[in-house]
């Protein structure tokens, strides 16, 4: 696959700072298991390269990245609440068995 350049991405994103922020957030999402939006023909591509390819292909924008982050954050919070609730139930069960 052709090499991706910053210039390719700057045709989509207005400035380098925004590009760096978008690419780093998206790369983190990809590294954490969020599936890529483009075909990953080269399995050796690192998450950063995939993120830049998605940006250059106009498959992702900052709004989509923020929505994915929000969904991941909500999922994590929900899981934490479920674990906390399970611990409370387990603690109550243990205190009842001590009686």
UniProtKB/Swiss-Prot annotation:
Molecular-function GO term, any one: DNA binding
Listed EC numbers: 2.7.7.6
Uppermost EC category: transferase
Keywords: DNA-directed RNA polymerase, Nucleotidyltransferase, Transcription, Transferase
Family: Belongs to the RNA polymerase subunit omega family.
NCBIfam families, per database record: rpoZ (TIGR00690)
Cited function: Promotes RNA polymerase assembly. Latches the N- and C-terminal regions of the beta' subunit thereby facilitating its interaction with the beta and alpha subunits.
Record-given protein name: DNA-directed RNA polymerase subunit omega
Native source organism of the sequence: Xylella fastidiosa (strain 9a5c)
């Amino acid at each position: 696959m052709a090499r991706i350049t910053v210039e390719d991405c700057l045709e989509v994103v207005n400035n380098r700072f925004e590009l760096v922020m978008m690419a780093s957030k998206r790369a983190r999402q990809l590294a954490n298991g969020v599936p890529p939006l483009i075909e990953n023909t080269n399995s050796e591509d690192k998450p950063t390269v995939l993120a830049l390819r998605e940006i250059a292909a106009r498959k992702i924008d900052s709004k989509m990245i923020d929505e994915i982050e929000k969904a991941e954050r909500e999922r994590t919070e929900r899981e934490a609440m479920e674990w906390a609730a399970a611990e409370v139930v387990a603690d109550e069960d243990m205190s009842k068995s001590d009686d």
